[in-house]
Amino acid sequence: MLKLCQTRFLLPNCFTLTAVGVVGVRRVWQSQSVIPLGAFLFGLVVGSFLNVCILRIPADKSIVLPASSCPKCGKAIAPYDNIPVLSWMILGGKCRNCKTKISIMYPSVELLTGLLFLACYFVFGLTVDALKWAIFSALLVVLTITDLRERILPDSVNFFGVGVGLLFSFFTKPTDGTALWIANRWFDFPPPQPVLSFVDAVLGALVGSGLLWVVAEGYFRLRGREGMGLGDVKMMAAVGVFLGLKRTLMTVLAGSLLGSVIGIVLISLSKKDRNYELPFGTFLGAGALLVLFFGTPALQWYQSLLAVK
């Protein structure tokens, strides 16, 4: 009887302590220091997975099995040797088993992805938009590095990007208002926001891929050889689904400028000739990231200049 009374007496206290603990954990999680750190660390882990995608997708291998191993000796990498960035630094950039040098690409991709996820949190907050742009950034990392290494832009990554971008369009705001502008001129009432967002995504994909297809076809007819693969066209469909029409055009412009500058520098330094195949997808990916984080302020600044004139 005494034990039962003690149990009944302690039970409310247990609930109180549990409630206090839950509130405390929530406050710590919502603090301004833990969430950015969590976003960065999660980005590092995702970056480790992106390395697997970069290496295996072009070779048409599974990104799930087998476990990661040293490309030289084939020894499976232990979990404690697979900690993003940190393991590479501890091992001195070498395989623990055969001492073969491990490419700096691995920690670079992990660190880049971590920083991009951190930037998505700071710019978009703890929102669905932040998740959308984090996934978009991860896709761009895979496409950019793969094109730089292999000169290909895998269809599986591009089509996955199109599908994910269209899916997110139903849960996020319209990207640039192009669909709303069209609706105001054709309808007496604006369509629902998910419809506007979906139309914005489709317009971005059509304009992005269509513009690059016209450029590629024109180059082929003028020069008699391909100057741009269809991978770039499909990549811009994925980029356009996420960014919408206006920022997709800005991406093409930014990517073209980056590619032109790098190409001129390489030729002027006599390191490459005029027929050198530049990885245009790499520059498009870099341009898309620049537009993602700086495109809206740049567009607002440009529109303000036009308004002044």
Which role does the model predict for each range below?
Residues 56-64, 122-126, 148, 173-177, ...:
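Transmembrane helix-loop junctions in multipass membrane proteins, especially transporters and channels
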Residues 29-37, 103, 107, 127-130, ...:
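Hydrophobic, aromatic-rich alpha-helical transmembrane segments
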Residues 230-231, 265-290:
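Interfacial loop-to-transmembrane junctions
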Residues 25-55:
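Long, highly hydrophobic alpha-helical transmembrane signal-anchor segments
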Residues 50, 54, 116, 120, ...:
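Alpha-helical membrane-inserting segments
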Residues 53-105:
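Membrane-proximal soluble regions of multi-pass membrane proteins
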Residues 39, 135-260, 300-309:
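Functional transmembrane core segments of multi-pass inner-membrane proteins
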